[in-house]
A protein has these predicted regions:
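Canonical helix-turn-helix DNA-binding module
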Residues: 33-64, 68, 72
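Basic, amphipathic "hinge/linker" alpha-helix immediately C-terminal to the N-terminal HTH DNA-binding motif
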Residues: 66-85
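A generic alpha-helix surface/boundary motif
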Residues: 85-87, 103-104
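N-terminal helix-turn-helix DNA-binding core of bacterial DNA-binding proteins
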Residues: 8-42
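Helix N-cap / loop-to-helix initiation motif
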Residues: 43, 96-100
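C-terminal regulatory/oligomerization modules of transcriptional regulators
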Residues: 107-145
């Protein structure tokens, strides 16, 4: 089920951090400030400030020099963000969009798309998966542009 876009009180930056942290935990087993900074291409000082803020908001637990872990609320939110990201990525791949364009478009859309639109895309992806011929027809129209 698609997740909600970032509410007014939560910045897209917080969502980017959560997504990065969960990805690191899933791939490396842990997330450190240095790894988050490298993944997001920002300074460690900026990451430390945001991590402390997210700790205060109850999204993660941070201990200086020891790393961090997501709280249940933080992990749930991060998983929803990743599912939203994956749904959009899968949809654009079905349409034959290049990986570079997909990355750019998904990063631009994922925090701002409404739950209603996500549900519609999810339904469309399901229908397209059941009708590969339709995907071929769509690709023939989009690759000519």
């Amino acid at each position: 089920m698609p997740s909600k876009p970032a509410p007014a009180g939560r910045s897209t930056a917080v969502e980017d951090y959560l997504e990065q942290i969960l990805d690191l935990i899933n791939t490396k087993g842990y997330a450190r400030v240095a790894d988050i900074a490298q993944g997001l291409k920002i300074s460690q000082a900026s990451v430390t400030n945001m991590v402390q803020r997210m700790d205060a908001e109850g999204l993660l637990k941070y201990e200086k020099y020891r790393g961090l872990v997501l709280t249940t609320a933080g992990e749930t939110l991060a998983r929803n963000i990743m599912q939203r990201h994956q749904l959009l990525t899968d949809f654009f791949r079905m349409l034959g969009i290049s990986e570079e364009v997909i990355y750019h478009d998904v990063e631009g859309m994922e925090h701002h798309i409404s739950p209603q639109t996500l549900r519609a895309i999810e339904a469309l992806v399901s229908e397209l998966q059941q009708n590969p011929r339709l995907i071929t027809n769509i690709k023939s129209h989009t690759h000519g542009s």
